[in-house]
Structures are given as structure tokens and as C-alpha cells.
Amino acid sequence: MGFLCPGSFSEGKRSAFTLMDLETGSRIPMGDVNEQKGWVKFRRFFFNPEAFIQGELWIQSCFKKDPGLLVIDEVGPMELEGGGWAKTLDTLAQNSTVAQLWMVRQEIVQEVLRKWSIPEDQVYTAESIDNLIQRWMP
């Protein structure tokens, strides 16, 4: 359970992305390089406030169903500056009852670890995903 943010690309650069609920497949526009009415600008993207509200609802519904794994895509610079999913991550970082997989860019992993007091041994790189799978599989 949780969500991913599949992207669209234009001229080799990410130009837009949607928030997708992993349980239902439901999607909502999340970000775009083109200005959208009512959306909030952060760096080169405009973000849909409704997508953050919907994502929060999806996360809350996950906890009602006791998920085996909660996926958050992605934790990025916006969250490090207190926006985006930051408040949700504050809560999730204190929850040790649900296994969580946070997608984080390599260049900001250390900042994310510090901000949410995550131990180094909880970090898995794309190259070590087999170790992650073995950890959660019986």
C-alpha cells in the first residue's frame, strides 16, 4: 500500500507526474512544469495541493487495513524544507509497527536520515534491493 509518482518526460526531462494509489490504481495529477491555476510552485514544478490531500487520505486508509508495507514516492527537497509530505513523514518516522519504503534521491539520503532520525542500517540502495526483499520475505 502507499503511492508512487510515475512521471512524464519531454525532451529527456521530467515534465509532469501523477500520484498513484498502489492499492486501487487511482491517479491524481501531482506536478507539472507548466503553471496550473491554484497549484503551488516549488523549484521548477507546480504542485497540486489536492494531490497532497488525497495522498494523506490514502495513507490514513492504509493504517486502517494494517498494511504489510507502506510505500512513499518520493521524499525530496520539498519535504526537507518542511513542505510536501513532511508532516506525514514526521508521523510515519515515529511508527515502528508498519514496514515503510521511502524513495529518496541518493544525493539527499543523509539529510533525510538526519531529519527523521532514521538509522543508517535502514537504508537500501537500488543495488541492494535484493537484501531488502529478503529482509521482508519469510
Residue ranges and their predicted role:
Residues 1, 68-69, 99-101:
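Residue-level preference for the first positions of well-ordered beta-strands
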Residues 1-44, 50:
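N-terminal phosphate/diphosphate-binding loop that engages ATP/GTP or pyrophosphate donors
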Residues 37-82, 88-90:
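Phosphate-binding/switch loop-helix module in NTP-utilizing enzymes
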Residues 2, 71, 120-123:
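Conserved beta-strand scaffold positions in the cores of enzyme catalytic domains, especially
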Residues 28-33, 46-49, 98-101, 128-132:
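Short, surface-exposed, polar/charged, turn-prone segments marking secondary-structure boundaries
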